[in-house]
Amino acid sequence: MKCSKCNKKAVTFIRYNGTYLCKQHFMEYVEKRVRKDIRKQGLRKGIIAVALSGGKDSLVALYLMNDLFGKHKDKELHAITVDEGIAGYRQKTIEIARKHCNFLGIEHHVVSFKEIIGLKLDEISKIRGELGECTYCGVFRRLCLNKKGNEINAKTIAMGHNLDDVSQSILMNFVKK
């Protein structure tokens, strides 16, 4: 398929409006949506923390926030990575996050479940009862982000959630009830 704007090869299709976009126009589309959301939310002066898992969505959020605010004198970017304590899982993405923060010159903070709640997710999974790990993980991850954000005096925590993430959370919560 061809890009709806320039006739180059399309790399994605935006379902809700029926638009095919090439790489360049997709990047412009995402940046425009992020800028619109930021204007709507109204970011304050001070520290903006980016929740950084080391995955593609949070890395895109980090780079976009750096492009938008990296040179602002009234805003300072930090990144926060949460280590849930899952053996063999998080160390690789922590290193990816650290590498990108070093490259961009952004201060990187790692906070762990163990540090904040006293248990790793692996330990929680052994004593969880009827509820699955996902129930605890999302709540504790947000708690860790908020605690570290408060500790570094962040005024805002930016997250790289996409519509699929939001939809999945809503559906999971609906199914659990």
Regions found by a protein language model. Give the residues of each.
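ATP-dependent adenylation/nucleotidyltransferase module used to activate substrates
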Residues: 2-176
